[in-house]
Amino acid sequence: MTTKTLTEEPSRKRFKTNKSEIIFKEAYLEESTTTSSSSSSDQPPRQIKFTQKHQSILLITHLKDPLKVQTEYPIPDLQPHEILVHNRAIGLNPIDWKGKKYGFGIYHFPWINGRESSGDIVKLGEQVDTSSYAVGHKVIISSTSYRDNRTSTFQQYTAIDSRLVWKLPESFSYEDGATIGVGLVTAGVILYNSFGFELAEKPEQINGTILIWGGATVVGLYLSQLAKIYGLKVIAIASTKHEEYLRKLGVDYLIDRHLSEDEIIEKIDEIEEVESIEYGVDCVSKETSKTVLRILDHKLKKEEKEKDEEEDVKNTQVKPKFSGIVGIPKEYPETVDVRDVVIKRFHEDVSYGRKFIEITNKFLNTRQVEPVRFKQYKGGLHIIDDALKDLEKIGANGEKYVVSV
């Protein structure tokens, strides 16, 4: 874990920069007269009333204008199933800088970016299950409802569906929690929705292999861990400087991404334990998606050739499945079954999203899935712009960029 600090670590009240003084107001929590007076540490936090009306946000006023911290911005109102979360650590994603730079994913001005965070519940909607969630609970959130700025995380307080949040494991820091949302949801959608894996705490084991191009991306890191839970062998295409870390997370075979396409295929063919590749995922680009598709096509045809000549052998071969996070080429081999990555299912299909949260929260609690390592920026909303510039320039290099608020 590496850290970049704007100044000395700020108090939660205020800090100074060379540009301005940013004030972060603490939530004012007033005890309700109707609640229990129990002070046992084993009891859930008491019901308390949240009275704060305004917050600070990081605002996009125009695509060409710099990001702006604005104070006295209204705190989101809650829908019946929603909770209000005081963000304590915020995870950054490439779309947070790409959307502004290239003009996509921003539907109106002013606009608030940010897709994931971890923090404390400060307010409950009318229909929140109070047997599961209470004010003061620490949670992890992932906002896949991109058009709703209330769910964005580049602000002090985020409104989010209570049925779609993880509880932060006791052994995790807020920064650990901020690495999880988007990466784990995306990895899960690929396995459970695109590839049709069983969504279960103790799933049936799968005898097969998955190839992940971009094994050191955050999605790749979580995908490798989930794949191992299902018994898959994992081939990762990534920089060899991450080899020790990737093997720790479950990667069986690492192939240097700097090799040529033909050299990578040759390296894969040299793996004696892998006769076939049933699943392929690209986490990087449309161009690398083409390469993964070529590898899957090559491996299937090679397997067919090596088999004894049997009647209708080609018709009985199961097509390998492929999903590309960034994009899928318009043309691809007929030998590959190409599947879309439907991220929005997480929030649109609440029954699926809720079950996904339930199962993966158990994986996190038992450390079957570990939070990925992170690069920490201290300085709250005001340092997000610097962190995004680093993310654009350097890229996510086997770690998550996280801002502590």
Placement of each model-derived feature along the sequence:
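Terminal helix/beta-alpha structural elements that buttress the NAD(P)+-binding lobe
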Residues: 4-36, 40-79, 86-124, 129-405
